[in-house]
Amino acid sequence: EVKLLESGGPLVQLGGSLKLSCAASGFDFSRYWMSWVRQAPGKGLEWIGEIDPNSSTINYTPSLKDKFIISRNDAKNTLYLQMSKVRSEDTALYYCARSPYYAMNYWGQGTSVTVSS
């Protein structure tokens, strides 16, 4: 059974940094593209970015590429999202997803991040 479990919230200070993790199990993590997606309160899903199995290609939504860093550790079956210089609009539910062939077919339950002033 494929499982994705996000962690790393819930509170971060305005202008601060936070690192989210996504622990994967039930599949060969090292073979798959992985993505991060978020959903702010009352808004739709926003794709953050994706990383390939070799960590050689990392794609980001242009508006977020300067403040978010996606990485992975295949030995630990874990995906990461490093957030920096957070603002109030970064308050959201953050999801990791398995994304073979650019179609996200397995999702975690999400981890909540609240930016506090």
UniProtKB/Swiss-Prot annotation:
Boundaries of every Ig-like domain copy: 1-116
Pfam families the record matches: V-set (PF07686)
A biological process from GO: immunoglobulin mediated immune response
Record's keyword terms, sorted: Adaptive immunity, Disulfide bond, Immunity, Immunoglobulin
UniProt entry tagged with the keyword Cell cycle: no
GO CC annotation terms, alphabetical: extracellular region; immunoglobulin complex
Gene Ontology MF: a single term: antigen binding
InterPro entries reported in the protein's UniProt record: Ig-like_dom (IPR007110), Ig-like_dom_sf (IPR036179), Ig-like_fold (IPR013783), Ig_sub (IPR003599), Ig_V-set (IPR013106), IgHV (IPR050199)
PROSITE patterns found in the cross-reference section: IG_LIKE (PS50835)
Keyword hit for RNA-binding: no
Disulfide bonds: C22-C96
CDD domains: IgV_H
Stretches that traverse the bilayer: none
Other facts noted in the record for this chain: This gamma-2a chain was isolated from a myeloma protein.
Name the record gives this protein: Ig heavy chain V region MOPC 173
